[in-house]
Swiss-Prot record:
Protein name: Putative type II secretion system M-type protein YghD
Superkingdom of source: Bacteria
Family: Belongs to the GSP M family.
Coiled-coil parts of chain: none
Periplasmic side: 61-178
Transmembrane spans: 40-60
Keywords associated with the record: Cell inner membrane, Cell membrane, Membrane, Protein transport, Transmembrane, Transmembrane helix, Transport
GO biological processes: protein secretion by the type II secretion system
Subcellular location: Cell inner membrane
Cytoplasmic side: 1-39
Gene3D superfamilies, sorted: General secretion pathway protein M, EpsM
């Protein structure tokens, strides 16, 4: 019932607004010649078309072109990365192949990360390393660098706290190819 009243009042309001608009339009066009009416109609159509083009069509077209360009760039980058991935993985794995090369990489990177190596031994597929007590954060940085740069992963490690805070004793450390 309330809904019906609302609909009825809305329809009455709409009819009044339409009749006012028709009255205003008829009043302005009443004294005009047919030629002026045609020119006014053409001007209204022209202004509407220009407004539509400037406010809606052109910004949408530019945005679509930008998105297409970004999409093409992303597709090209994706293709390059997919093509480069096997080469990168192969280069990482083949960077250190012989035990002598692996030992050299381990010792060079250890000195760069403040890790002192006591002994390195070849254990078939793996390399076992004995090191002096080391700062825990330095040990983590060194192990992370070996993993990221040379694909050498820790296969076994035994760590215990040293007497000094922040220092650790590494009883057993073994690397394998990742």
């Amino acid at each position: 019932m309330l809904r019906d009243k609302f609909i009825h009042y809305f329809q009455q309001w709409r009819e009044r607004q339409l009749s006012r608009g028709e009255h205003w339009l008829a009043q302005h066009l009443a004294g005009r010649s047919p030629r002026e009416k045609g020119m006014l109609l053409a001007a209204v159509v022209f202004l509407f078309s220009v407004g539509y083009y400037v406010l809606i069509w052109q910004p949408l077209s530019e945005r679509i072109e930008q998105q297409e360009t970004i999409l093409q760039q992303l597709v090209a980058m994706n293709t390059r990365l997919k093509n480069a991935a096997p080469d990168i993985i192969a280069a990482r794995k083949s960077a250190t192949t012989t035990p002598a090369q692996v030992s050299r990489v381990i010792s060079d990177s250890a000195s760069a990360h403040s890790v002192v190596i006591r002994r390195i031994a070849d254990r078939g597929e793996n390399i076992q390393v004995w090191i002096e007590p080391v700062v825990f954060n330095d040990l983590l940085k060194w192990l992370n660098a070996l993993d990221e740069k040379y694909a050498l992963r820790v296969t076994q490690i035994d760590v215990s706290a040293a007497e000094k805070p922040g220092m650790v004793n590494v009883q057993r450390l073994e690397f394998g190819r990742g």
